[in-house]
A protein has these predicted regions:
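Beta-strand-rich N-terminal accessory domains
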Residues: 1-110, 237, 243-244
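Generic structural motif
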Residues: 20-22, 30, 65-72, 97-103, ...
């Protein structure tokens, strides 16, 4: 929901910020997000809009926290929002409530409950992430198993909730977003919710994604230029800055290396199930406050 704070403009649904010409940013509660992909159940961050077209596809947007507990991943399923205008900047305060886990479901049998199956699945996903030579085989294996057993990806309540506050300061004239992440805790409906625990959580990832069919080209300050599958699904960026490019809409978004974090790039496009491209900052759980700048650029 969008929460009213003293002196701030509020909205009951989406918050939309115009950038340049037909390009804008949008964030809103999960029920206002398109439902084309399994990740529609997840709470998204700032997504790019061009002439009314959502460019995020399956991507979760800019500045979205994800938590790792070993090989298990926790996703945001709810949000509280507030915003205000400061000169040429608009400030959005988002509190993400981390309360969803990925599950497999069968239309006839419902949610798969086998702990051993999820143990295997999560370890294979971790192998896919960490060992690039195995990715093609693991993707083919996943697709085969899903087809054979009629499995689909869903996201269900995890049974616990952690809160992560993310402030976005958007300079619409410059096309710059300053993102401040605070994992020390927040409140939900007036009740305190714990932040990210130092023990138990093994990694905090701040995702910055849009759609893979739009942003299909990677470029960085070292001169590397990659397209499509050559980008990889989760590879570390070593250059000082890096961008994803959408030639159709003449757009790019760019991030830089930040002390205390590792920057990863990725792109996946698998049928109608997966379509994301972008970056993730990987942080240890002890780093509970983190700030970075994301630039959105209009290309010639």
């Amino acid at each position: 929901m969008v929460q009213k704070l003293a002196g701030e403009k509020t909205s009951d649904k989406d918050i939309t910020i115009p950038l340049f010409s037909e390009i804008s940013l949008k964030i809103g509660p999960v029920f206002a997000i398109r439902e084309d992909y399994p990740t529609s159940r997840l709470q998204k961050g700032l997504i790019l809009i061009s002439n009314g077209q959502d460019l995020a596809e399956e991507g979760v947007g800019f500045g979205v926290p994800v938590l790792k507990m070993g090989v298990k991943t926790i996703f945001p399923g709810e949000i509280e929002l507030a915003y205000l205008v400061e000169g040429s900047c608009q400030v959005i305060e988002a509190i993400y409530f981390m309360n969803l886990e990925e599950r497999l479901t069968n239309q006839s049998l419902g949610s798969v409950q086998s702990r051993s199956l999820y143990w295997i699945k999560n370890h294979l996903a971790d192998l896919h992430r960490r060992f690039p030579p195995a990715r093609s085989f693991l993707t083919a294996l996943s697709n085969k198993l899903r087809s054979s057993f009629g499995w689909q990806t869903t996201f269900e309540e995890a049974g616990y909730t952690y809160s992560v506050k993310v402030n976005y300061t958007v300079d619409s004239q410059a096309g710059v977003i300053v993102v401040k992440v605070d994992a020390t805790g927040a409140t939900m409906n007036g009740a305190p919710k714990g932040g990210v625990p130092i023990h138990g959580i093994t990694e905090v990832i701040v995702m910055n994604e849009q759609g893979a069919q739009h942003f299909d080209t990677y470029s960085d300050s070292s001169g590397t230029l990659l397209r499509g599958e050559a980008i990889g699904s989760w590879d570390q960026v070593t250059a000082g800055s890096a961008s994803f490019i959408c030639s159709t809409h003449r757009l790019a978004f760019r991030l830089q290396q930040i002390d205390g974090a590792r920057l990863f790039r990725g792109m996946e496009l698998i049928g109608s199930r997966v379509a994301w491209s972008g970056f993730g900052y990987s942080l240890p759980p002890t780093n509970q406050r983190f700030t970075y700048r994301l630039s959105i650029e209009r290309l010639a």
